[in-house]
């Protein structure tokens, strides 16, 4: 079903054998994390990722929503959002809620980023501080771009070095825009950190992730820590056979 690879103390990769396995693993992990949080603490606080892959995962979650113990205990936030002028065409919020609406999460527990407001980042940080106990999310979902960015933490941008703020507007020169994003300080303290990669378009990225020497560190590689590792879920088509063969046997574990 999957191969577990321990890259280092801060990163653990689970490579699914098929696209179906990839979605099943991601869905099971999400629902299991939600149910454990609801059972232990009475609620599930999650920060969602944008991108195409999470939308597929959301579809699987909706199909299996009967397995969620109590959808009324879910509190939904976003990890990042596009500039206001792109909202209608590419809003992470709109795309996600078009699917997740079937979970019937109370509207008062769905927190959208307002990128049109110049102080939207401060407002969103205050919402997190008000509603998320100790500002610790139960789960933060992360996508990964071909340049190694995650959320809207792009290579070479100022938000990568933010030490105090939980949410900021980040200027992204390579896209000629700015985006609102969570920062490392709040992401790293989440109880469960998980990144998703799938598709042949990410093969070069995966090659670099598996061969980190001689290059700059990607933003996504700065998320996990030895005390709170980042769990990766990958589809088999994003990893070349030759790259997997390079991994020492003692770092791999076949799982069924």
Swiss-Prot record:
What are the EC numbers?
A: 3.1.1.31
Q: Which domain of life is it from?
A: Bacteria
Q: Which InterPro entries match?
A: 6-phosphogluconolactonase_DevB, Glc/Gal-6P_isomerase, NagB/RpiA_transferase-like, PGLS
Pfam families attached to this UniProt entry: Glucosamine_iso (PF01182)
Signal sequence range:
none
Q: Which GO terms describe its molecular function?
A: 6-phosphogluconolactonase activity
Q: In which pathway does it act?
A: Carbohydrate degradation; pentose phosphate pathway; D-ribulose 5-phosphate from D-glucose 6-phosphate (oxidative stage): step 2/3
SUPFAM superfamilies in the record: NagB/RpiA/CoA transferase-like
Alphabetized, the UniProt keywords read: Hydrolase
The protein's annotated catalytic reaction(s) are: 6-phospho-D-glucono-1,5-lactone + H2O = 6-phospho-D-gluconate + H(+)
GO BP, one annotated term? pentose-phosphate shunt
Member of which family? Belongs to the glucosamine/galactosamine-6-phosphate isomerase family. 6-phosphogluconolactonase subfamily.
Q: What does this protein do?
A: Hydrolysis of 6-phosphogluconolactone to 6-phosphogluconate.
Record's protein name: 6-phosphogluconolactonase
């Amino acid at each position: 079903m999957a191969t577990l690879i321990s890259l280092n103390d801060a990163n653990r990769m689970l490579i699914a054998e098929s696209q179906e396995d990839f979605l099943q693993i991601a869905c099971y992990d999400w629902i299991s994390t939600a149910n454990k949080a609801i059972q232990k603490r009475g609620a599930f606080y999650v920060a969602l990722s944008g991108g195409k892959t999470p939308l597929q995962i959301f579809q699987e979650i909706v199909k299996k929503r009967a397995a969620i113990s109590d959808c009324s205990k879910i509190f939904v936030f976003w990890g990042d959002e596009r500039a206001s002028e792109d909202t209608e065409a590419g809003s992470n919020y709109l795309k996600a809620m078009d699917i997740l609406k079937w979970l019937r999460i109370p509207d008062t527990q769905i927190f959208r980023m307002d990128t049109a407001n110049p102080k939207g980042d401060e407002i969103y940080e205050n919402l997190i501080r008000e509603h998320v106990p100790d500002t610790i999310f139960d789960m933060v979902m992360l996508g990964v771009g071909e340049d190694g960015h995650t959320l809207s933490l792009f290579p070479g941008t100022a938000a990568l070095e933010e030490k105090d703020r939980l949410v900021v507007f980040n200027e992204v020169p390579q896209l000629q825009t700015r985006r609102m994003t969570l920062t490392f300080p709040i992401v790293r303290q989440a109880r469960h950190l998980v990144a998703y990669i799938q598709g042949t378009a990410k093969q070069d990225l995966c090659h670099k992730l598996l061969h980190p020497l001689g290059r700059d560190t990607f933003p996504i590689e700065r998320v996990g820590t030895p005390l709170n590792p980042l769990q990766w879920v990958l589809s088999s088509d994003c990893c070349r056979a030759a790259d997997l063969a390079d991994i020492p046997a003692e770092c791999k574990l076949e799982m069924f």
